[in-house]
């Protein structure tokens, strides 16, 4: 706890600076970050996702991506001292009327598909929009670094939303449903599942991609209506999330239909603004070929 207070205090001294000043810092450290932080992974991901693009085009995407990544870092730190008025001015939402209409019709649970696109941490401020007619929550996977994990739990929860550990998702959602309160739950669903959790593959960015199906799977069980969040960046320091209806009753459509549709929408967004997606992770390290080999060999443990 003492170490966390020191860590948070250090970040607070950065956070008190206005965002325009923090963006100067962002531009400065970006010069170094783009030369040493997971550059091989980023370049390989871009090469295989966009084989039709020239090397110069991919280099341009890489450059813009690292600027976005560094901006995200300082924007997230800024959350420590950003006022309610400022976050509501900088992070706006469209389609909230569609959510309220369905809540008014009696559906208490709403699942919002999100991605590692733009600044996904600021989306937690959506809870301010629900002060009179609902609440929000977000599914999260604990980070390996305890200090960072505690920080982001605090940052996400400061707007009044509920933090739900990934492994407790279904149980907690059943508890929330019993409360009888309107809930919007955000699912960031573009991460790579573990071997034991792979059940479905989709064509995504020129790869046969293992995907997470948990959001749709749970929505079918609890009759949560589902939407897709389309993130845009009108200008530096400002984001907008359009909430697009997908399906009011997920169990009424064939299984994995909404998962497939989510990745179709996300791929279109990435192709439109590739620099806004998170390219630093080995998204395609678990291939379908290797998965089939493991299935045939009866390998169940994680690596």
Model-derived segments and their meaning:
Residues 17, 50-53, 131, 222, ...:
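A broad structural signal for alpha-helix termini and local helix breaks/kinks
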Residues 59-63, 101-104, 154, 167-303:
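Non-catalytic C-terminal accessory region of glycerolipid acyltransferases
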Residues 40, 145-146, 208-210:
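Active-site metal-coordination segments of metallo-dependent hydrolases
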Residues 34-36, 94-100, 104-109, 126-135, ...:
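Short, charged helix-to-loop "capping" segments that act as catalytic/coupling loops
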Residues 107-167, 194-203:
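Catalytic core of membrane glycerolipid acyltransferases/transacylases, capturing the structured
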Residues 1-114, 119-120, 149-154, 160:
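Membrane-anchoring hydrophobic helices of lipid-metabolizing enzymes
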């Amino acid at each position: 706890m003492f170490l966390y207070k020191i860590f948070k205090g250090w970040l607070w001294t950065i956070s008190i600076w206005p965002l325009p000043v923090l963006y100067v810092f962002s531009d400065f450290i970006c010069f170094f970050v783009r030369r040493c932080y997971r550059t091989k992974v980023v370049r390989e991901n871009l090469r295989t996702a966009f084989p039709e693009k020239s090397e110069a085009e991919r280099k341009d995407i890489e450059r813009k991506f690292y600027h976005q990544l560094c901006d995200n870092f300082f924007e997230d730190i800024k959350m420590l001292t950003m006022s309610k008025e400022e976050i509501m001015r900088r992070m706006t939402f469209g389609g909230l009327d569609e959510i309220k209409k369905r809540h008014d019709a009696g559906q208490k649970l709403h699942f919002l598909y999100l991605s590692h696109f733009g600044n996904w941490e600021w989306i937690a401020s959506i809870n301010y929009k629900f002060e009179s007619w609902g609440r929000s929550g977000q599914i999260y996977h604990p980070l390996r670094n305890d200090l960072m994990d505690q920080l982001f739990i605090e940052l996400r929860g400061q707007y009044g939303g509920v933090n739900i550990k990934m492994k407790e998702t279904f149980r907690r959602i059943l508890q929330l449903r019993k409360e009888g309160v309107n809930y919007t739950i955000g699912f960031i669903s573009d991460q790579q599942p573990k071997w034991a959790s792979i059940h479905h593959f989709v064509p995504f960015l020129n790869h046969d991609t293992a995907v997470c199906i948990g959001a749709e799977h749970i929505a079918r069980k609890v009759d949560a209506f589902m939407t897709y969040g389309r993130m845009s960046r009108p200008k530096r320091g400002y984001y907008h999330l359009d909430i697009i209806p997908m399906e009011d009753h997920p169990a009424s459509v064939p299984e994995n239909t909404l998962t497939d549709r989510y990745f179709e929408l996300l791929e279109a967004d990435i192709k439109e603004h590739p620099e806004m997606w998170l390219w630093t992770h080995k998204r395609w390290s678990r291939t379908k070929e290797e998965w089939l080999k493991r299935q045939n060999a009866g390998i169940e443990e994680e690596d």
